[in-house]
């Protein structure tokens, strides 16, 4: 994950790198850049053909990052549903998309936050070994986390 070009802090950084590669006609590395950042081939190809001024917008940059991080996630939590929810929210709020793209924001961190809240709820219910949290409660935790952490 982000092995060749690293984790970009913004869509602007990602697009600047893509612009440099395109100007150098280094399509091989442009493909690597897109793959590392979860950018679909179709979007990359449109950019390569100079049909778009930028490789990606903030929403696609965020969704791409989430998809890349999802492939790495192995802790057993229902990460796919969380990525779907966050992706939908990125379409609704560009500030969230920009926040997701930040280097210091990760899917792993979101999942850890949900796990901490679940563990807290287990402690509150004496004798409970686990707690079931409906999707809407998990999404409410994500919304609360987003409000506190975006920036």
Model regions: which residues?
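Low-complexity, interaction-prone regions
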Residues: 1-82, 89, 150-151
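Charged, amphipathic alpha-helical linker/scaffold segments
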Residues: 61-119
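Long, highly charged low-complexity segments enriched in Glu/Asp and Lys/Arg with interspersed Ser/Thr
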Residues: 120-151
């Amino acid at each position: 994950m982000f092995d060749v070009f690293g984790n970009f802090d913004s869509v602007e950084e990602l697009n600047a790198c893509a612009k440099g590669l395109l100007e150098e006609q280094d399509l091989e590395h442009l493909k690597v850049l897109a793959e590392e950042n979860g950018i679909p081939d179709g979007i990359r190809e449109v950019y390569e053909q100079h049909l778009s001024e930028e490789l990606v917008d903030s929403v696609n940059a965020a969704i791409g990052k989430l998809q890349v991080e999802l492939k790495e996630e192995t802790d057993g939590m229902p990460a796919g549903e969380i990525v779907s929810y966050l992706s939908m929210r990125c379409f609704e709020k560009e500030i969230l998309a920009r926040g997701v793209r930040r280097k210091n924001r990760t899917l792993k961190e979101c999942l850890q936050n949900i796990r901490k809240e679940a563990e807290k709820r287990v402690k509150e219910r004496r004798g409970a070994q686990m707690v079931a949290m409906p999707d809407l409660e998990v999404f409410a935790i994500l919304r609360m986390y987003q409000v506190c952490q975006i920036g």
